[in-house]
């Protein structure tokens, strides 16, 4: 028997499905929502519905967007010849914070992880290859996370992309190994971008 009423137990169970939210955090969030005004609870519910209804993936780079193509791909002042490959859409803001990158992005939506059953077919690689085919790109910067999975992904992509004749670089290890670039500060990310190397 649950120690909470069924609607509260259900909300806690749903909140626990969010990344980084354990049982205690889910309980705190659920009770915060319960104490909130009905208007605030409705605003939260509307925001969740809007995200699901109005956001989609950019048809070019796979970034999450409400317009297609996204603002990066549609911006004529950005260098379309330089593509920065990241694992997740949240990684883009880490690169943008440096104010030293004016190219475009490609979001893989993950990294290779054989232990977790994530192979190349689970990532958004095929449209990256189409973007570089026939000399459409001068350089591809592999800005995957400095983890075992991120390094494996970078190595895999490097082999494929070099066969297309494009320059392939990897961000420098100014970003600590085992971390997520989403949490890198501007200076660290800037140094990582400046110190990228050929693969």
From Swiss-Prot:
> Where would I find the C4-type zinc fingers in this protein?
58-73
Pfam families (alphabetical): RecR_C (PF21175), RecR_HhH (PF21176), RecR_ZnF (PF02132), Toprim_4 (PF13662)
Q: Which GO terms describe its molecular function?
A: DNA binding; zinc ion binding
**Boundaries of every Toprim domain copy:** 81-176
What GO biological process term is on the record, naming one? Answer: DNA recombination
Q: Which UniProt keywords apply?
A: DNA damage, DNA recombination, DNA repair, Metal-binding, Zinc, Zinc-finger
Matches recorded under InterPro entries:
DNA_Rcmb_RecR, Rcmb_RecR, Rcmb_RecR_Znf, TOPRIM_dom, TOPRIM_RecR
Q: Please name the PROSITE patterns in this protein's record.
A: TOPRIM
Q: Which domain of life is it from?
A: Bacteria
The similarity annotation says: Belongs to the RecR family.
- Its job: May play a role in DNA repair. It seems to be involved in an RecBC-independent recombinational process of DNA repair. It may act with RecF and RecO.
The UniProt entry, under NCBIfam families, shows: recR
Q: Which HAMAP family match?
A: RecR
**PANTHER family, from UniProt?**
RECOMBINATION PROTEIN RECR
Name of this protein: Recombination protein RecR
Species name for this entry?
Koribacter versatilis (strain Ellin345)
Q: What is the lineage of its organism?
A: Bacteria, Pseudomonadati, Acidobacteriota, Terriglobia, Terriglobales
């Amino acid at each position: 028997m649950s120690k909470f009423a069924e609607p509260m137990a259900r909300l806690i169970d749903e909140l626990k499905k969010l990344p980084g939210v354990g049982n205690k955090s889910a309980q705190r969030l659920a009770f915060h929502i319960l104490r909130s005004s009905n208007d605030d609870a409705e605003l939260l519910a509307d925001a969740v519905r809007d995200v699901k209804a109005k956001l989609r993936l950019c048809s070019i780079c796979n970034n999450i967007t409400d317009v297609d193509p996204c603002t990066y791909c549609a911006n004529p002042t950005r260098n379309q010849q330089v593509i920065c490959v990241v694992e997740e859409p949240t990684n883009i803001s880490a690169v943008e914070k440096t104010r030293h990158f004016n190219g475009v992005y490609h979001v893989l939506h993950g990294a290779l992880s054989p232990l977790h059953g994530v192979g190349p077919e689970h990532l958004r690689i095929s449209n990256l290859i189409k973007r570089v085919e026939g000399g459409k790109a001068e350089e591809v910067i592999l800005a995957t996370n400095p983890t075992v999975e991120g390094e494996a992904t970078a190595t895999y992509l490097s082999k494929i992309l070099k066969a297309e004749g494009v320059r392939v670089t990897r961000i420098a290890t100014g970003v600590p190994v085992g971390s997520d670039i989403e949490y890198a500060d501007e200076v660290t990310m800037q140094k990582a971008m400046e110190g990228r190397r050929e693969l």
